Amino acid sequence: MGRGKVVLQRIENKISRQVTFAKRRNGLLKKAYELSILCDAEVALVLFSHAGRLYQFSSSSNMLKTLERYQRYIYASQDAAAPTSDEMQNNYQEYVNLKAHVEILQQSQRNLLGEDLAPLATNELEQLESQVVRTLKQIRSRKTQVLLDELCDLKRKEQMLQDANRVLKRKLDEIDVEAAPPQPPWNGNCSNGHGGGGGVFSSEPPQPEHFFQALGLHAVDVNQPPAPPPGGYPPEWMA
């Protein structure tokens, strides 16, 4: 099994603490020396024990030169990071202007909502009214444009549905034509019982006898001689 995580805390036993300090100090000084040799780095190490004893290491010949270089670097970084008085003044003025602009916008918003109208003068109320009227015009114009766009979209969908309906109707008509039974061919000639010459086919059905009776006519027998008229036969000179 692996070793558990070691919790770093102060060693309470004084002798053990001194022994551990000596070991870790020597290891730290050795690591600083190796780092300066292997990486050609300028290393300065300052260490004070619990009793106040100083231990130090410097890769250069003089520790003070390394410390002076460190101080110059730190102060230069602080001077570059710290803003000048002019920059601070400009930043503060910009902050004040932005804050005032935000307050004006908030007050204008409250006035448009009908709030805080008591302090406004007549001309300010007129300007506010004009602004509200312009805003309403813009809102109505935008609303009209949205409605027109929706109407155009609905018309486009309606046209698409009509086109699809026509296509379906045409397909249904084609299906009905294909499913209809074929009609037999019609011959215009009509043959009699003897197979003789043809005659003209009449599409009108024969009229029954009661049809002539309804018109005041009677069926006539061709083998019977015609009846004399009511006044008798006419004279021979009229025949």
Curated annotation (Swiss-Prot):
Residues 179-208 are annotated as: Disordered. Residues 1-61 form the MADS-box domain. One of its GO terms (molecular function) is protein dimerization activity. One of its GO terms (biological process) is regulation of transcription by RNA polymerase II. SMART domains: MADS (SM00432). SUPFAM superfamilies: SRF-like. Its main location: nucleus. Probable transcription factor. This is MADS-box transcription factor 34. The gene is MADS34.
